[in-house]
Amino acid sequence: TISWHGCGSLRLAYSEDEMDWLRQTLSVGSALGFNIELVGTDQIARLHPFYNLDGVLGALYTPDDGHVDPSNVAMALAAGARQLGATIVRRCRATSIRPAADAGWAICTEQGDITCEHVVNAGGTYARQMGEWTGHVLPMTSMTHHYLVTETVPQFEDLKDELPVIRDDQQVSGYIRMEQKKCLIGIYEKTNPNTVWEDHCPWDAENELFTTDYDRIMPWLENTFERMPILAGLGISREVHGAISHPPDGNPLIGPAPGRRNYWCCCGTQIGIGWGPGLTRELARWMVHGSADV
């Protein structure tokens, strides 16, 4: 099981410029066959009666959207890969990558060397320093992201259906969704971002988390409580403050790296759980057939 919650999502717009962007996204999504529609405040209120819609002009509603447990997805993908013949070696750090004599690649690891025809740099926060092994300069940095989980929300207790995820870039700088009968608030600090590991991510870091910086996120948290007043009097049951790799333009670094045959990048994917399946499918097609379908 991957714990999929198909609750849908609403991406809000507060200005005509934002509405134009939603219309453009609607056009692209509809052309690709997605179930997606532009809705007004009356329908938003029906879908999510606890959200303050002052100033909201409309939203992009994606009924088939939702959220999922990333660790469960990773385990399911690993199981599928093993069924197709892949070997996954855990607790085995790569220490260098170098060209092999047969025009392939030699990867040195803590458990011995591996030779291969293709190599994919999917190193996450380590991708930049791994790229240095082969002379590649990958433009990316690690920026921190908070999410907080409230105590149980009394108004959620009797809900039959899960509320749609709210994506409110202007007021929350992130997203708000149900976490069972609690509420999860994810904040991307776009006006005062914080970077870590400017030189290199420590090799011994594992699920590295940082102290919650309430001073930095407080303006967004206050906005959240104004938008969802039912959360204002609740305590916080869980705090998470971790690093995510970001390229300068927000787009993933994917495809063949220049100057090196059969060296591929799949990194800088700041929305890993959302982009991962599609990006890796297209990268695999690119590697096998010489081009992607998009």
Regions from the PLM with identified roles:
Residues 6, 40-41, 90-92, 109, ...:
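Short loop/edge segments at beta-strand edges and connector loops
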Residues 70, 171, 180, 194-195, ...:
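C-terminal catalytic lobe of FAD-dependent flavoproteins
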Residues 17, 48-56, 98-106, 246-250, ...:
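A short, glycine/Asx- and small/polar-enriched loop/turn
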Residues 60-118, 126, 277:
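Helical element adjacent to the flavin cofactor pocket in flavoenzyme catalytic cores
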Residues 5-9, 143-145, 239:
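Short Gly/Ser/Thr- and Asp/Glu-enriched loop/turn motifs at secondary-structure junctions
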Residues 97-211, 222, 227-228:
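Flavin-dependent oxidoreductases
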Residues 1-47, 171-176, 180-184:
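Dinucleotide-binding Rossmann-like beta1-alpha1 core, especially the glycine-rich loop
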Residues 2-11, 45-84, 199-208, 261-268:
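Helix-loop-beta segment of a Rossmann-like dinucleotide-binding subdomain
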